[in-house]
A protein has these predicted regions:
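C-terminal "cap" of GNAT-fold acetyltransferases
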Residues: 125-139, 144-182
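Extreme N-terminal starter segment of soluble prokaryotic enzymes
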Residues: 5-7
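Conserved phosphate-binding and hydrolysis motifs of nucleotide-dependent enzymes
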Residues: 74, 105-107, 146
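Residues that form or flank phosphate/diphosphate-binding pockets in enzymes
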Residues: 87, 105, 137
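Conserved GNAT acetyl-CoA-binding A-motif
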Residues: 111, 118-130
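Acetyl-CoA-dependent GNAT
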Residues: 13-14, 20-21, 26-94, 98-100, ...
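Active-site acidic-Proline motif in GNAT/NAT acetyltransferases
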Residues: 98-100, 104, 133-134
Length: 182
């Protein structure tokens, strides 16, 4: 099966309502994948996400995968640390793909585009993220993009008394002295 064509673009304020709808659905369908909860998120106005979008050159940005008809299929964020001594780090956050678009290459394309933009940010040396450890498909997706596990936080998210572990991962960027293309 060939996935439908899609394009990756930087999210801006024109995408706020589509982003909120995608996020609310992702929180409803896969609550263990996020630290935010659906009940709280649905109460947030779309405009409250505007400050997260930023601009790629700053190291804080969100990307979207768009279908040919303009529908938002998925998104991923990169949030650079604001503190001076951690400005070399950014967190990959909010990776989500609409259920009907999963396993069609959207997630892989979003991660690749995020890494490529992050590599262009002056002084940015590493990307870090957490992923639900039991979500092995997504863990493998990040590993294929060059991320490596460095720790596990047991019961990082607890939903109805059930704990979900989070795997901590890092990917060194070319600006880092620890970067190795091998």
């Amino acid at each position: 099966m060939t996935p439908a064509p899609f394009r990756i673009d930087v999210l801006g304020t024109a995408h706020l309502h589509a982003y909120k709808a995608l996020r609310d659905e992702a929180l409803r369908c896969a609550p263990e994948a996020f630290t935010s909860d659906h009940a709280s998120a649905v109460l947030r106005p779309a405009q409250s996400y505007a400050e997260r979008f930023g601009a790629p050159a700053t190291g804080t940005f969100f990307l979207g995968a768009f279908a040919a008809d303009g529908q938002l299929l998925g998104s991923i964020g990169c949030e650079r640390e604001a503190r001076l001594q951690q400005r070399h780090c950014a967190s990959v956050v909010g990776m989500m793909v609409a259920p009907h678009a999963q396993r069609g290459g959207v997630g892989r394309a979003l991660v690749q585009a995020c890494v490529q933009l992050a590599e262009q940010v002056a002084g940015l040396e590493q990307l870090v993220l957490t992923v639900t450890a039991a979500n092995t498909h997504v863990v493998r997706l990040y590993e294929r993009a060059g991320f490596r596990a460095w720790g596990l936080l047991p019961r990082a998210v607890v939903i109805q008394s059930i704990g979900h572990d989070k795997l901590h991962m890092v990917r060194w960027l070319p600006a880092s002295p620890l970067f190795s293309a091998a």
